Every structure is written in structure tokens, then in C-alpha cells.
Amino acid sequence: MDSCHKIDYGLYALEILAQYHNVSVNPEEIKHRFDTDGTGLGLTSWLLAAKSLELKVKQVKKTIDRLNFISLPALVWREDGRHFILTKVSKEANRYLIFDLEQRNPRVLEQSEFEALYQGHIILIASRSSVAGKLAKFDFTWFIPAIIKYRRIFIETLVVSVFLQLFALITPLFFQVVMDKVLVHRGFSTLNVITVALSVVVVFEIILSGLRTYIFAHSTSRIDVELGAKLFRHLLALPISYFESRRVGDTVARVRELDQIRNFLTGQALTSVLDLLFSFIFFAVMWYYSPKLTLVILFSLPCYAAWSVFISPILRRRLDDKFSRNADNQSFLVESVTAINTIKAMAVSPQMTNIWDKQLAGYVAAGFKVTVLATIGQQGIQLIQKTVMIINLWLGAHLVISGDLSIGQLIAFNMLAGQIVAPVIRLAQIWQDFQQVGISVTRLGDVLNSPTESYHGKLALPEINGDITFRNIRFRYKPDSPVILDNINLSIKQGEVIGIVGRSGSGKSTLTKLIQRFYIPENGQVLIDGHDLALADPNWLRRQVGVVLQDNVLLNRSIIDNISLANPGMSVEKVIYAAKLAGAHDFISELREGYNTIVGEQGAGLSGGQRQRIAIARALVNNPKILIFDEATSALDYESEHIIMRNMHKICKGRTVIIIAHRLSTVKNADRIIVMEKGKIVEQGKHKELLSEPESLYSYLYQLQSD
């Protein structure tokens, strides 16, 4: 118990959960406000503290078998103060992934272990932004506000549909009159009148039908544009972690699902629904003609529905399998094209072709299964339709023979029945499209329902100076992954040049990703000029931080467009000055088109060293106050590197510079060198100071490179 009083696990849990929801928290302030007696946060004070951070919290009692239905992560509250965070529940394996606040590590518990710790009290946590996100999630209900927005257009479509249905009602009546009156009484004058009237009806029906299609296509195209624009904006606003945890081809396949939704919106499905809504009027007229024949039609409708419901789940599973295989093909194709140099260099084209053939065969087989099942579904619909037609023919003929129905009435009845059955059959036949759209909406929802980087309510602060502070930083990429950064405390002064070295996987690049606010630390704060980056607008921050990576991507544009990417209106003089600092001006001037040279896709028209120098110029052109070189010179030839190092004084002047390097000669002139090992800072000092310690890690690495 004493250890519980020394460490307030409730406060620690609040800090972790707040960071998870991108909410900044100052533990000392929370402790001062809510832990008035110094014994730690009790349940009531913990709930008040969480609400003060604009978190939505709710204490509930749940039995263990209901835990897989709650939103995670959640805090499991214990009376002895040894709380823990529940992050995942696997009911199939009867295992529970928790974050142990005492050991500060994730743990997997078996059912019996969890039962021994769980006391039935759990606190559900959500940020207000996440609650709003759930209310605005993308599914079929997303289209309701869009329909309301364009309600005038849809009302016009509805009005046109009413007139079309009235014309559809009049036409059978004309045929009835012709059969029962004109033919019997040889009324040629009446026939002429009916023919003219029917011609007018047909002309108006064609015009209104075309008008309805135009209005409907126009409105759905607007919705399509809005959805497409929303999708791309949302995609670019997603955090780096989203893209790092998914294959490129999988993301592309999900985005392409927009085509399926587009085809559905502009197809016949929705107009068929409108036509079906007017069936009640036709039923009333048909009932007037013959209740018996009408009952046959009525009883056939549940048969259509039952058959579609029976086919649907099987069809959906097969469509899902088809999509998954298509996503695998997309991923493999993107990977193969991206790695074409490696594939050719290693002469592994036959192996890659073999893999592609197998995957393609699997996709084609999945598509064939979908086609077969869809065909079975359509033939089942046709069987019901033909059966109803035969029954109506037999029963209708009996009614005509017995004098209960005239020939004209039978023909009119069948025409009216066709107006009811036709949209039903169309809907049943396009049920496959609806199933596909349902999967498309779900897949697209994976993109649109993923939380974006939080911009709203974040602070856009004045121009930064360049002071950087890491305070008690602890970070891991996933709750169940190893710790990448552990207890990092580091202060970097404005204008200081810092070198960061260490073995691969020691956390060097991760440290700079926290500066760019690509991730929020699990524990601790990253401060720039004393401002917590968890509260800062990411765009405001990144505009003032220049980053050069080991492998930079150039866009398929001109060199000047690539350098001035963040500010297209920048003067040519500034672009040239940045290119000179980066040692790129000379080779650019030798190109035929100079700065207007198109670099090709991902800069394929340039050498690796040339691409790197353009990337350095791109990072310098906006005069950032913080400049990060993450193995930026490792791909340069010695001459290009010499030019960069010669200009390093000008490059570093007036800005804070962080240089990550494996080549220690790159950082030996830095104001301070940070040595990292297994996520911790183990040494720091100037080049000569670190070498003066022969047993230091820096000396060891330097000796290896000297040899």
C-alpha cells in the first residue's frame, strides 16, 4: 500500500488516457487542484479531473462477459489504488491486454488472472471530438444530410415521378377502352381520339422520364463531388500512424470503392425505389379490377423479398472475399512497380510472376463465385416472375370465361401488375449492386471514420524561436509494442546544432517525429518555446520545421515547383538562394530546362544525390527556425557532401539544427552530440569530450568507423 501512496496510479492513468485522446495534461496542476489531501486521486476527484480536461467519462459496473462490448481503452478502477488500463479484449482466446500502471508495461492476462484483478468497476473515457466523430461516422446515414441539403431537387424528382406514375396508370385504361369498347363497337372516331391522347401521353412520359434522369443525375453528381472532396481532404488529414499500419495498395483499393458508390447513386436503384413507392395506387386500381388476381401479385412480393434475403449473406461474404483479394493484388502490384529496380537487379521476375499468377487466379475465382451466385439469384427472381405470370394467365382466363372480368380489364390488369413487378424485379436484380455498395461504404468508412490529426481548438502560436524541450518522454508506437523512447529529458537551446548518433533502432528518428508532432508521447511533454506541442496546431508547427530524410520523395513537377512546394508564390531569387546553399544550383543550371525541368515520378529523372540536394533546398527555402537532417547526407557523393558541409555554417545560422547521422564525421562539429542506446540518452557532450572517454559508446562507434 505504501507504494500506492508514493505513486498515484490514478493520476498516471489520467495522463496516459488524456494523451491517447490528444488532450494535453499537466500532472502537477491536476494534483494541485484535485489531490488536496495528498493521498492521491479518489474516484470522485478523478472523474472531476477528467471532466476538467474536456473528456467524456462515465463510471459503470460491468460483468466480465460484457467487457467486449465497451469502448476501449478504459480504466479499471480498484479500491486499493492499483488501477490498470484495459486496452483489448479477446473473447475467443479468453485473454485481456492491459497496461500495467505499476510496471509501466503492457501485459496479456488469462481469464483467471483477469478475474482475480477485476472488481467490476470500470470508467469509460472519450474525447468530445471522438464523440462527435462517432455521431458523424460515414455509413449509409451520411447521405441523409446530403439529401436534405438538395431536398428541392429531390422534391422536383418526386413530383416528376408522380406524373410518370399517373401516365403509367392512364395507359392501361386506354388499352382497356380499345379492347372492350372500340373493337366491339367498331368505333373508329373513338380509336383516333385514344390514339392521339396515347401519343401525347407517350411524348410527355418520355420527356418527363428524361427530365427525371437528368435532375437525379445532376443532384447525385453533386453528392459525388462532395464525397470525393471530403475523402481526399480526410485522407491527407490522417495521422502518419494510419499509413504506416496499412499497405499502400489496401488504402488505394479502399479509395477506389468510391467508384462503386458513384455507380450506385447514378444508376436505376433509387429511381426504382421511387417507382415502388407508388405501387399502392396501382394496388388500389388492381383490387378494383380483381381481388383474386391482386392477391396473387401480393403473395409474390414476399417471395421476391425472401429469395433476396436468403441470397444476401452468402453474396456479401463472397463479395468481401473478392474485395480482399483485389486489395492484395493492388498491394502486390504497387509493391512490384515500386521495387522494379530490385526485381530486375536480382532477376526474380519469374518468382514475382508466379506469385501474381496465384493471386490473380484467386481473385478471378472469387469473382466467378460472385457471378455464379448473382446469376442464381437472378434466375430465382425470373422463376418467381414466370410462375406468377402463369398463375395469373390461368386464373385470369377463368375469370374472363366466367364473365367476372372482361378481356380489356385482364389486359389492363396485367399492364398495371407489370408496373408493380418491374421495379421489384429491378430492385431484386440490383441487390448484388446494393451488397457491393454496402461493402464499399464499409471499406470507405475505414478511411473516413479514422480519426484525423486534431486541428480544431489547437493553438496557432507566433513564429517560433527554436527552443526545444523533451520532458520525461516515454513513447511506444502501439500499446502492446516495445518502448521506443524511455525517460527522455533533453533541452536544446535556440540556435544550437545538435548531433544525434547511436545504433540502428535506438530511437533517433522517433525523437524527431515527436518534434514534428507526428505522434503524441505516451508520457511526458514535448515543448517548443515552452509551448506543449499536444496543444499546438500541427500545420502551424510543420510550416516552421524543415525536414530532410534519407529517402525523400519528389513530385512529378518542375524543380522550381518542388523546391517552392510549400509556398508556390515564392520568388525565383529565394529558390535559387536555397538551391545554392544545398549545392544544387550548379547541376540544375546545366540541365536543358534549368529550374523548369520536370523531375519525373518520385524524381526518377534525377540521380539519388541530385534528388537529395533538391530536398535539402526544399527544406531551406522557407527559412525554418528548426531544421532536421535525418541521415540527409548519407546518399550524397563526397563532392556534394563537401559542398553541403562547406555551407553548413550558413545553413545553421539563426536556426536550431538537429542532425541524425550514422557517419560520425557529419556531427563532429556540432555544439553537442547526443548518444542514444535502446531508447535512452546514454551520453552527451562535444566530440572531443566524448572521445576522451575510451569506454564510451561514442568512442566505440568512432573507432569502428576509423578502422
UniProtKB/Swiss-Prot annotation:
GO terms for cellular component: plasma membrane; type I protein secretion system complex. It is a multi-pass membrane protein. Residues 154-436 form the ABC transmembrane type-1 domain. Its main location: membrane. InterPro entries: AAA+_ATPase, ABC1_TM_dom, ABC1_TM_sf, ABC_transporter-like_ATP-bd, ABC_transporter-like_CS, ATPase_T1SS_HlyB, P-loop_NTPase, Peptidase_C39. It holds the Pfam family Peptidase_C39. One of its GO terms (biological process) is proteolysis. It comes from the Bacteria. The chain crosses the membrane at residues 158-178, 191-211, 269-289, 295-315, 388-408. Keywords: ATP-binding, Cell inner membrane, Cell membrane, Hydrolase, Membrane, Nucleotide-binding, Transmembrane, Transmembrane helix, Transport. GO terms for molecular function: ABC-type oligopeptide transporter activity; ATP binding; ATP hydrolysis activity; peptidase activity. ATP binds at G502, R503, S504, G505, S506, G507, K508, S509. It is found in: Cell inner membrane. The keyword ATP-binding applies. The active site is at H83. Residues 3-125 form the Peptidase C39 domain. Residues 468-703 form the ABC transporter domain. Signal peptide: none annotated. Homodimer. The complex HlyBD-TolC (OMF) forms a single transport channel across the two membranes, allowing direct export of alpha-hemolysin. These channel is involved in type 1 secretion system. In HlyB the peptidase C39 domain, the ATP-binding domain (NBD) and the transmembrane domain (TMD) are fused. Part of the ABC transporter complex HlyBD involved in hemolysin export. Transmembrane domains (TMD) form a pore in the inner membrane and the ATP-binding domain (NBD) is responsible for energy generation. Belongs to the ABC transporter superfamily. Protein-1 exporter (TC 3.A.1.109) family. PANTHER family: ATP-BINDING CASSETTE SUB-FAMILY B MEMBER 10, MITOCHONDRIAL, ATP-DEPENDENT PERMEASE MDL1, MITOCHONDRIAL. This is Alpha-hemolysin translocation ATP-binding protein HlyB. It comes from Escherichia coli.
